Amino acid sequence: MTTKNVTDENFESEVLKADKPTLVDFWAEWCGPCKQIGPILEEISNEMRSEVVIAKHNIDDHPNQSTKYGVRGIPTMLLFKGGELKATKVGATTKSNIVSWI
């Protein structure tokens, strides 16, 4: 399993109504730190697929959700459980930090 791309249009069905906790990575193509954590999130997605969904949301292509959730810098990771925002992490970090944060 790889990370899932989410858009403004499918955010509710793919994130808010998900049956598992969902980590959403708000990112952009031009963002260097976003490119750093991309492969890390792919690894986590593969290793923890039974526990959590890892989703990516491109803020340039789909700006509505980033505005709604007050994303001001990227990468920003938001963790949703049961349709509610539970935690926020801003900036690139290590795999072990992301896993323990989840």
Question: What do these predicted regions represent?
Answer:
Residues 19-21, 36-57:
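Conserved helix-turn-beta segment immediately C-terminal to the redox Cys motif
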Residues 19-20, 26-30, 73:
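Short pre-active-site segment immediately N-terminal to redox-active cysteine/selenocysteine motifs
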Residues 26-40:
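Conserved redox-active cysteine motifs that mediate thiol-disulfide chemistry
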Residues 73, 78-102:
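Non-catalytic, surface beta->alpha helical segment in thiol-disulfide oxidoreductase systems
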Residues 2, 7, 27, 55:
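Conserved Rossmann-like nucleotide-binding pocket used by diverse enzymes
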Residues 59-65:
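Structural microenvironment flanking redox-active thiols in thiol-disulfide oxidoreductases
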Residues 4-22, 63:
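A short beta-strand-turn-helix
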